[in-house]
C-alpha cells in the first residue's frame, strides 16, 4: 500500500498491479523502506547536530566545557586542522563549525568515511553509496520517493544504504565523538538497572531521549546542594536520577547513573 500522494492510497492487487503513478509493489516497498531509513537518519543525525552546536557554545567555566581535550585535538588532526598553539576552546569552536558543515556541504563525501578499512571504503565507492552531506541524503530520499519519481527498487535501496551510512558514519559519528569531547570519554563502570533503582522517599527524575546535552545538565544540577536542600524542604529525603533508552546509557557510562529500564 502506498500513501505518499493525495490521489492514494494505492493498494496493489492482482487486478491492479500498479499505482496511479505507475509504481509497482517492488517500487512501493522500496519507497516505504527508504522513507523509514531517511526518518531514522534524520533523527539520529539531528542528535549529532545538537551536540555539534553545543560544542560551539562551550567555554572555560561555562555550563558546557571541554572535558576531553586530548580527544578533541586527536579529531582535529584527523580532519587536517592545525592545533599547535591554539586555545582549546578556539579549537572547539572551529571544530563545531566544521562538523556542522558536514550536514550541508556542497561537494565531497563524509569526512568520517576515512576511518573505515580501505577495502570497505573501496566497496562503498564501487557501489556508489558513499554519503555526501548528511542533510542532502535525507532530502534526496524524500525527493526520490515522491509521486512520479523513482520507482526502481534497486535505486531506492541504494539510496537507503547511502542514508544509513550518512547517519552511522556521519551524524551519529558526530554525536558520539563530540559528546565524548564535551562530557568525557566513558570508561568501564558499575551501576544498577531495572525499576528497583527508584526510591519512594526521594524525588525521582528519569532522563530519556537521544541528546545528552540536557540529561548531563539535569545530573549536574540535581547533585547540587541547592536542589537537594529544596527537595528536602518539600518533604523528600533527596533526589534520585535514573534513565531509560539512549540517554540512560550516556549518563550510566559517564556518571554511573542507574537505568530504570533493563537495557
Residue ranges of each PLM-predicted region?
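Metallocofactor- and cofactor-centric catalytic cores in central/energy metabolism, strongly enriched
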Residues: 1-263
Amino acid at each position: 500500500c502506498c500513501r505518499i500522494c493525495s490521489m492514494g492510497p494505492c493498494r496493489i492487487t492482482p487486478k491492479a498491479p500498479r499505482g496511479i503513478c505507475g509504481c509497482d509493489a517492488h517500487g512501493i516497498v522500496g519507497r516505504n523502506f527508504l522513507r523509514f531509513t531517511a526518518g531514522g537518519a534524520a533523527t539520529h543525525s539531528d542528535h549529532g547536530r545538537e551536540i555539534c552546536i553545543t560544542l560551539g557554545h562551550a567555554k572555560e567555566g561555562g555550563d558546557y566545557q571541554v572535558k576531553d581535550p586530548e580527544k578533541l585535538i586527536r579529531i582535529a588532526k584527523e580532519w587536517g586542522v592545525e592545533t599547535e598553539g591554539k586555545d582549546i576552546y578556539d579549537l572547539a569552536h572551529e571544530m563545531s563549525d566544521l562538523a556542522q558543515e558536514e550536514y550541508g556541504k556542497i561537494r565531497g563525501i563524509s569526512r568520517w568515511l576515512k576511518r573505515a578499512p580501505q577495502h570497505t571504503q573501496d566497496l562503498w565507492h564501487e557501489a556508489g553509496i558513499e554519503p555526501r552531506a548528511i542533510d542532502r541524503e535525507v532530502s534526496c530520499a524524500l525527493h526520490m520517493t515522491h509521486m512520479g519519481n523513482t520507482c526502481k527498487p534497486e535505486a531506492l535501496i541504494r539510496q537507503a544504504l547511502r542514508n544509513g551510512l550518512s547517519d552511522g558514519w556521519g551524524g551519529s559519528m558526530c554525536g558520539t565523538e563530540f559528546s565524548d569531547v564535551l562530557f568525557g570519554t566513558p570508561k568501564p563502570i558499575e551501576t544498577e538497572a531495572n525499576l528497583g533503582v527508584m526510591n519512594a522517599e526521594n524525588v525521582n527524575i528519569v532522563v530519556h531521549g537521544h541528546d545528552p546535552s540536557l540529561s548531563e545538565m539535569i545530573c549536574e544540577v540535581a547533585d547540587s546542594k541547592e536542589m537537594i536542600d529544596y527537595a528536602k524542604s518539600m518533604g523528600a529525603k533527596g533526589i534520585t536520577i535514573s534513565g531509560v533508552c539512549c540517554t540512560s546509557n550516556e549518563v550510566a557510562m559517564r556518571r554511573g547513573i542507574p537505568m530504570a529500564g533493563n537495557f
